[in-house]
């Protein structure tokens, strides 16, 4: 499998008020920008405020970057991203099949200033209205999902 990104599914069908865009990209740093670009496209459609888009991009960047950096330890793999629009919220789910970790283990930098890169989970928790993380050491795969309520229904 080469380095190409695969758009797995793009639907605009109204299934109980939900619209979903799915993207599957190689677990490499240069593909984080593609995940951000897909989010920017959705933001244009929804006419989201710039400040909200900036927060969403930061949370997304941290989630995808964590999978790229940690899940596969430099080896080959993929990261799947789903953007789900429901009512007045955007849910973003990032899934990998790499090495799991203990989500309860505190960050070594906890308590320091939040900046992009290094405190990803803390940053996402701060930005999101809802947050879920499923991963375990010694078990393959991690699933991170965050929800941000939008100011207007989608």
PLM feature segments, named:
Residues 62-66:
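Conserved polar catalytic motif of the HATPase_c/GHKL fold
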Residues 36-39, 96-98:
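Short, small-residue-rich loop/turn micro-motifs
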Residues 22-34:
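STAS-typified acidic loop motif
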Residues 37-61, 113-114:
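Conserved short strand/loop->alpha-helix "switch" segment adjacent to the catalytic nucleotide/phosphoryl-transfer site
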Residues 1-22, 67-154:
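Conserved beta-strand-loop-beta-strand hairpin that lines the nucleotide-binding pocket
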């Amino acid at each position: 499998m080469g380095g190409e990104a695969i758009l797995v599914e793009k639907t605009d069908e109204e299934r109980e008020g939900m619209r979903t865009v799915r993207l599957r990209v190689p677990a490499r740093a240069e593909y984080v920008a593609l995940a951000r670009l897909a989010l920017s496209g959705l933001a244009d459609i929804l006419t989201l405020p710039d400040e909200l888009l900036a927060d969403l991009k930061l949370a997304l960047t941290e989630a995808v970057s964590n999978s790229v950096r940690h899940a596969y330890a430099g080896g080959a793999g993929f990261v799947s991203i789903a953007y789900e629009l429901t009512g007045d919220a955007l849910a973003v789910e990032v899934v990998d099949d790499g090495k799991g970790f203990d989500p309860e283990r505190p960050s070594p930098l906890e308590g320091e200033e939040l900046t992009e890169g290094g405190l990803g989970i803390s940053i996402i928790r701060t930005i999101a209205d809802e947050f879920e993380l499923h991963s375990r050491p010694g078990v393959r795969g991690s699933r991170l999902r965050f929800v941000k309520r939008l100011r207007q229904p989608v």
